Amino acid sequence: MNARRKLVLVDGSGYLYRAFHALPPLQNSRGEPTGAVLGVVNMLNKLCREESPELIAVVFDAPGRTFRDELFEQYKATRTPMPDDLRSQLQPLLDCVEALGLPLLRITGVEADDVIGTLAKQAAAKDMDVLISTGDKDIAQMVSERITLVNTMTDSRLDRQGVKNKFDVWPEQIMDYLALIGDSIDNIPGIDKVGPKTAAKWLNEYGTLDQLVKNAAAVSGKVGDNLRAGLQTLELSRKLATIDSNLTLECDLESLVRREPNKQRLRELYTRLEFRQLLRAIEGGAAAAGAPMTPPPAVESAAAAARPPTNYTTVLTMEDLQRWLERLQSAELIALHVEAVSLDYMEAEIVGLAFSIEPGTAAYVPLLHDYAGAPQQLPAATVLQALQPLLENEQLAKIGHHLKYGEHALKRKGIELRGMRFDSMLESYVWNSTATRHEIDAVVRRYLGFDPLHYEDLTGRGAKQIPFSQVAIDTATSYAAENADVVLQLHRVLWENISGVPAMRMLYEEIEQPLVPVLYRMEQAGVLIDGELLRQQSLELARHMREIEARAHEAAGGPFSLDSPKQLQDVLYGKLGLPVLGKTATGQPSTAEAVLEELAEKYELPRMILDYRGFAKLKSTYTDKLPLQINRTSQRVHTCYHQAVAATGRLSSMEPNLQNIPIRTPEGRRIRQAFVAPPGWCIVAADYSQIELRIMAHLSGDAGLLSAFAEERDIHQATAAEVFSLPLEQVSDDQRRTAKMINFGLIYGMSAFGLASRLGIERSEAKRYVELYFERYPGVRRYMDETRQQARERGYVETVFGRRLYLNDIASRNAALRQGAERQAINAPMQGTAADIIKRAMIEVDRWLSTSSIPARLLLQVHDELVFEVQQDAAAELMARARELMSAAAELRTSLKVDVGSGANWDEAH
């Protein structure tokens, strides 16, 4: 019996977008982006190697309007334009596809989905097997006994039953399903507030959209009202979502035969794109699409776990709980998701817990769901008591996504979570800190290729949002169990990539993951705030603001609101006729801070406005707000430290942000006076001195800088002496100030123009200073030039500890964006290395505090500074040990200097 012929249809446009968004940005030495092309070529090679198709077509959307645009003028109107760095990769990719011998289709007037649907239907009618490679849910409507979908992102396949398992509707119901839920990306209206669950429920009950419409009057509740309100657009939504599989195409199936690759053309393309591995494969006889080759360490090429049909269980009986406890006890890795009612971890009340130990299988244990008709749940105390030995078992490895939050929630119930080996949020962050936001929804979309359930889909938004405890338990199970399930899948994909890069693995295992319990303890400790002192400062700031307001009214010749940009424009530029130095996006004269700073050099009123704004910000952000954030139980303020926000590796402090309290003004420093120690205790602050300049000396290896630090000279005075060719003792204060600005300006990639602006000198003079600096410190210039070149070639720079800092705009055609990325390339290794060093110091200090009997706590991390609370009689020991441990946190070619002080409050200790 002859084997059935196979046709493979590839959603080329989908491949391109997914490769662009899922892979680290790459570019060749000319600065041309190439990462998406490489990703698609590798995916095509893999697909052809595994499927060996006789017939194949790679289908792309053609430019121009389609019949859907004629049906609905707003179709896809909300889509963001294709990024320039993606657009520039389209033609090179088309060239590569053709050179690989793969038939390429771009048909004007129709979408790629319609071409794929038509060819699939024709082939199935001729008894061929059809495999459609796509991540697009719309094409699920084409699945039949002969037509299957494959998602190369997850290696998962969807036959008819697979579609039913994934969407809870059959393929022939998909267009009705899509019409109901709509599509925000394609701007398909759908029915307001109708999500996948409701759409599937209706279609399972009524069979078709037409039958649902006939029975619309019988659908009760708010969702029924929404259905009836949207009936007029439903047919339009269905037409927009339905694939036209009856096109008349000029090509026939036999024209889709896979051809021999054009090796010479591939050599030319791969040489220009600098795909060295693919070039080697050609020379080794593996030029054809599908020939074996080692893929780069990218997510698409990882052995990502297939996403099987899900089996999510709600645990409502002790028997079910006991069965899951037995499974968890023998699991290699437990994925844990804690669902709680408050984003404030000090107030978080656990509503339920979800577990997963294998992809596709998970359980949710509801504890506190409280709504009319809610099923009986196991007593929370009973469940937590049963789980406590497992959760506190250090030997049972656990993983979560931002699991520190769950750790806090469990702490409130007397459970100390142990055995946390992995966190998929941190894995995503270590793999590529700039690729995406690191919330679970975004990470799943990027690395698993599907859109998970969203929290707000369950709870609603804004004023009408309900607490999770009022979400129906079956719906909550789908959400919470999926959260636990995808964490395991993300770990499989991300850890394979991270563990393949030794420096990244070290960064994760020795810095990021060990830091989690340190931050947890700092957050639990909180910091003592003198609320009454802050309230007094608020009154004083308000008085200063009133005084400034009175003087401003006098200077302007009449009253106006200093808080109103429009009134400021009228007074500054209309009434007083000050020069317009900048404009807003709408063309209005700007009152931004930078503009006012420049005007304040010559005019009195702009300086008053800046002072007023400074006082207003201190008042609203700190002196008014901090007393309200004192926890009613601990009587302390508890910030939240985020590891996966700043691209450079810096920690972020939020709710409240305690890292941006000003220190350069007397009023800002006074706020730090409200950070106090309890009676008998004191505050100790330990601060790295000029750490980024020391890192610059290490990275550049410049003999002059290294010598200055080795001899413990005043680095700014030493720089001034070098630049101005003076003995150290003859350097003036102004010359030292200039040298300081040059030192720090160069770290942040400041140009001669920026330096001139900061110093208030001519650009030519600033340029001369920079040239003199580089003459005296040639190693710094060499390091900067080499770093910029490496950034262009690789698309990223690295810290001393191997943290990769991707520069998405390093190859941009936009000069401003490109130059900004080049400045980041210089600064990021220094800022990132400083972040890595203080994290290492925190881990070592915490290890010492945890194993010693010293009465002290680490409270805050603020940039290059650690703040402690210690009993007064132990302060000297802490200060000596903190200096020692922080100084030893990294071995650089320069020593790390740590300044340590103590006092009754933070200001005194600094």
Outline where the language-model segments fall.
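Short active-site loop/helix that positions an aromatic residue
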Residues: 16-22, 140-145, 343-344, 404-414, ...
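Noncatalytic, basic helical substrate-engagement surface that gates or grips nucleic-acid strands
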Residues: 2-133, 137-161, 233-236, 242-250, ...
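Short hydrophobic beta-strand that contains or immediately precedes a catalytic carboxylate
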Residues: 9-10, 132-134, 334-336, 400, ...
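Active-site-proximal helix-loop-helix substrate-binding element of RNase H-like nuclease domains
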Residues: 106, 157-185, 304-312, 344, ...
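Conserved catalytic core of nucleic-acid polymerases
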Residues: 466-469, 517, 521-524, 579, ...
